[in-house]
């Protein structure tokens, strides 16, 4: 059975996942598709490996923005798709192929039937890291086209197709990467008293970090410290001179993030003293919380509930990280979850979003944009 135009686009994009600021094929695919629209009212700019598109309205008084992240993840795909990734060790495991396809569908609808206001589409690289939203927002390319209102979405495997979920105010957490390098003194396994073992130091650090959440964060607040990777040592009979911990910090408040980092630094200083080692801390990429504009979100939820076929759910905050939060710091707007009904979750090698969600999203977002684009 033949698949629809936009499902085919999603499958094409799914084949070519690329990591942050290396999305060259994805960028070219987007540009090639936009070229097929060939409309005098469409303007295109390239920024890094992203694309910014403006559709000029008939009688513009504001600019409405839609942001789609376009990068993939360093994950080996296990979906069994015929259209699985052709890039070894990389996969669209967070739905950015779906986000981009919906953006192209919404762009197509906007070109086909122009609204009063201008529309700007931000096909943004590097959401998974090192972060593309903030530099794109600050770029010269976007300066003239900066939206007055902006919206974004993220697929949600746990919600059924035909459903969206969002809330006013805080939606996603503040996030920060965490990298700690420990350096001590290596030695022979038979003479531990002559060395400073960085495997043991790393083990103590991991267990002590967990006390930050239970003893330094308000129980009515939420925070997470996860160490996802530890490396160290060379062979079984040599005491490790170095070790490295890699993890993530997530909090629902800016104040908690500051407190958690302060406690991490104090604990690491204690590890340095206890194990006579040196430690270097790097917080890597840090994403601001996603905080939805209350009035716009409330208006959007009411519109979708009353004037479209989609079901609206009021959800709770999530510890998810999203650099779209930087855009919402400067531009009123909102983000929402789009139900895609997948057995496997985000960042899983077997994530399989239900493709029926794509055209449903294009249809109801087109309805919303046309409605919003004629309101003062």
Curated annotation (Swiss-Prot):
Active site residues according to the UniProt entry: 69, 128 (proton acceptor)
Disulfide bonds: none
InterPro entries, A to Z: AcetylDAP_deacetylase, Amidohydrolase, Bact_exopeptidase_dim_dom, Peptidase_M20, Peptidase_M20_dimer
Pfam families the record matches: M20_dimer, Peptidase_M20
SUPFAM superfamilies: Bacterial exopeptidase dimerisation domain, Zn-dependent exopeptidases
One Gene Ontology term of the molecular function aspect: N-acetyldiaminopimelate deacetylase activity
Catalytic activity of the protein: N-acetyl-(2S,6S)-2,6-diaminopimelate + H2O = (2S,6S)-2,6-diaminopimelate + acetate
Protein EC: 3.5.1.47
GO biological process, one term: diaminopimelate biosynthetic process
Class of enzymatic activity (EC top level): hydrolase
Biological or metabolic pathway of the protein: Amino-acid biosynthesis; L-lysine biosynthesis via DAP pathway; LL-2,6-diaminopimelate from (S)-tetrahydrodipicolinate (acetylase route): step 3/3
UniProt keyword terms in alphabetical order: Amino-acid biosynthesis, Diaminopimelate biosynthesis, Hydrolase, Lysine biosynthesis
Function: Catalyzes the conversion of N-acetyl-diaminopimelate to diaminopimelate and acetate.
Family to which this protein belongs: Belongs to the peptidase M20A family. N-acetyldiaminopimelate deacetylase subfamily.
HAMAP family per UniProt: DapEL
UniProt xrefs under NCBIfam families: amidohydrolases (TIGR01891)
Protein name per the record: N-acetyldiaminopimelate deacetylase
């Amino acid at each position: 059975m033949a698949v629809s135009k936009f499902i085919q686009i999603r499958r094409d994009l799914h084949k070519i996942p690329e990591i942050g600021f290396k999305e060259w094929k994805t960028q070219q695919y987007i540009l090639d598709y936009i070229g097929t629209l060939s409309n005098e009212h469409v303007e295109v700019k390239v920024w890094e490996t992203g694309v910014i598109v403006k559709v000029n309205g008939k009688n513009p008084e504001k600019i409405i923005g839609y942001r789609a992240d376009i990068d993939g993840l360093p994950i080996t795909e296990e979906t069994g798709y015929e259209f699985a990734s052709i890039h070894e060790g990389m996969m669209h495991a967070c739905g950015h192929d779906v986000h981009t396809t919906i953006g192209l569908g919404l762009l197509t609808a906007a070109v086909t039937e122009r609204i009063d206001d201008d529309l700007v589409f931000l096909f943004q690289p590097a959401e998974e890291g090192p972060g593309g939203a903030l530099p794109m927002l600050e770029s010269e390319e976007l300066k003239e086209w900066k939206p007055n209102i902006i919206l974004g979405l993220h697929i949600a495997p746990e919600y059924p197709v035909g459903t969206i979920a969002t809330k006013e105010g805080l939606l996603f957490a503040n996030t920060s990467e965490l990298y700690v390098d420990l350096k001590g003194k290596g030695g022979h396994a038979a003479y531990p008293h002559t060395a400073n073992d960085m495997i043991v130091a790393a083990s103590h650090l991991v267990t002590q970090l967990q006390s930050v959440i239970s003893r330094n964060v308000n129980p009515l607040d939420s925070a997470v410290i996860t160490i996802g990777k530890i490396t160290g040592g060379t062979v079984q009979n040599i005491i490790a001179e170095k070790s490295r911990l890699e993890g993530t910090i997530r909090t629902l408040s800016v104040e908690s993030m500051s407190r958690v980092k302060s406690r991490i630094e104090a604990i690491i200083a204690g590890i340095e003293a206890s194990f006579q080692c040196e430690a270097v801390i790097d917080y890597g990429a840090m994403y601001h919380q996603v905080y939805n504009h209350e009035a716009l979100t409330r208006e959007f939820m009411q519109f979708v509930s009353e004037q479209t076929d989609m079901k609206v759910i009021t959800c709770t905050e999530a510890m998810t990280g999203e650099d779209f939060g930087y855009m919402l710091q400067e531009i009123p707007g909102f983000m929402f979850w789009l139900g895609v009904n997948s057995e496997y979750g985000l960042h899983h090698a077997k994530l399989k979003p239900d493709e029926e969600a794509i055209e449903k999203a294009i249809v109801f977002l087109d309805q919303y944009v046309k409605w919003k684009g004629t309101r003062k």
